[in-house]
Amino acid sequence: MSLSEEQRRAVERTGQDVCCVAGPGSGKTRVLVERFAWLIGDGMDPGRILAITFTEKAATEIKRRLAERFAGQGALRERIEHAPVSTVHGFCATLLREHALDAGLDPGFRVLDELEAETLRIEAADAVLDEWAIGRTREFRELVDAWACENPAAHLRAVHEALRKGGDVGEQLREMGGFDEAGALEFLAAEARALTEIAERNTENRRTKIEAVEAWLGRRGEMDALAWVLDLALNRQGLDKGASAQGQRVMAAKEEALAVLAGSRHQPQREVLRALLLEYDAEYQRRKAAEAAVDFHDLEARTLALLGRDGPAPREIVERYDAILMDELQDTNPVQWRILERLRRPDRFFAVGDLNQSIYGFRHAEPGLFQSYQEKLEAEGREIDRLETNYRSRPGILSFASAVAERSAGVRPHQLIPREAPFAPKPVPVVEIQRFQADPDAGEGASGSEAKWIVYRLEELKRELQVGDPPRPVRWKDMAVLARTKALFGELEAEFAARGIPCAVRRGRNFFDEQEVVDFTNLLRYLASPLDEIALYAVLRSPFFGIGDQEILVERREGRYPPAEAGPVLERLLAARESEPPDRILARFLDERGYLRGCPARVRANAAKFLGLLRTWHSAAPG
């Protein structure tokens, strides 16, 4: 199929950096491949074209398409197969291996996969928290009480990861300032006043909402600052477009003010947390250095530092590329963008992406970077290419998606035009809407009714639908259920299991953050360190024993801690440490407690995976 006119304009644009804003199903990957091929056809050496993607699958697909494109040109195809087409992290790793000494790395460094890195982070966090629990008990308990969470180690790791988004963690923590309460409150008030000034009041609903904001502004100074901020309520539904957008800024300012007020009220704990984070960061770095290893963030940070050095190496790296092609630019994070800025030469950058499709799962992706890039080119009078023809979806799906998206906060307008070629007719509507309400008589919530209906409707569709070319009956693996929140997953799993329908749940969570894995980890932490009160408390509250907070408090106050129903069991486990490997201890314990009995397949699979990891780790480092 030949390129459309809008695709061709993007592929052949010259004399400027290119920004291609591509809607879903509009051929983003094809345009990037064709740009690569067009540059080769224009005489550019494939080895001097750098193409960066965000997944190995995408990089492989680009190379496959290019190889097919030049299938009859042996020598050229071979050069294409060796062209620098890779993920961001693949590119960084290659560059750092070439310049390991300049980057301050062991030339034989290895890259930790996410599971290995997470394991080191868990070990580092546990080690530091154990030291604090024993050596700085009072400060540690005050911090944990203020944190009000069951898993301080997971929270510590999460805060550390968030800080890494901004660069060097130690530098950020050392430069961390105080909280400007007055500034945050004034900014919130200014945003609210701006809303009252621009909002239309031509309906009773609009007038009532804006007058409520004015009344809230009038109460400033009459109540505690935190209570005043919490008192602000604003439903933007029904407001005019400009007021709705400003209302979103008001609520963002409210969240910022709450964060500032909360931080200010916990300043002592904040200082303790800063010290704890610095120790954790140092411990994590030490453990990586001991293995001559780096994680994905290190790849980015060290590449950025390498490109910022004085000397011939950075200049040679920049000069080796005549063109840089970037796929899915909306998934770029700030460090990656700074790497691109140091690599790029003027008018040699080609980027495709869609602000409305950022998947955020790529380490700290910041869609605003793509928006800023687009706005910068527009301010310079450069052309922006827009791909608006959708080749993937039926017109009914596109019109429904557009109707929903245009009312959603943070979604930028982008027209989706269905391709002219008609789809084969379907025996069922392409979009169905079903409304659910809780049934108090049946004692069932809306989610239970919804799960039943979804399973029933999927069974109907499986009997009715034909897919593919040539048509074939639809299979279960052809179907997917998307949920706005994870709350529905349990109901759905139960309904699918009851009907004998196979399903696999993708929760988008880290394996080590799954509740059952947290339970296993807490038990092992306690067995490794019986003085770890946090781990013991979590074990007692978990499904292993199911002891409530009040009972734990009473038992502890009366000197029965651990409580009678848990004490003997835990003593047997502690005794078994001397003669049995941890995976066998945990497996027998799970069997004795009936922990996995009646659990969904996902939980059983996670347990099997965790036990396998334990076996591997213990074999590699027994004891």
Stretch-by-stretch model annotation:
Residues 1-64, 115, 123, 193, ...:
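Conserved motor-region signature of P-loop NTPase helicases/translocases
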Residues 15, 46-57, 70-228, 294, ...:
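Conserved ATP-dependent motor core of P-loop NTPases, especially the RecA-like helicase ATPase domain
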Residues 86-94, 146-165, 275-279, 297-299, ...:
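Core structural elements
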Residues 106-109, 134-144, 159, 171-176, ...:
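Short coil/turn segments at secondary-structure boundaries
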Residues 446-451, 455, 536-582:
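Polynucleotide-recognition surfaces of large bacterial nucleic-acid defense/processing enzymes
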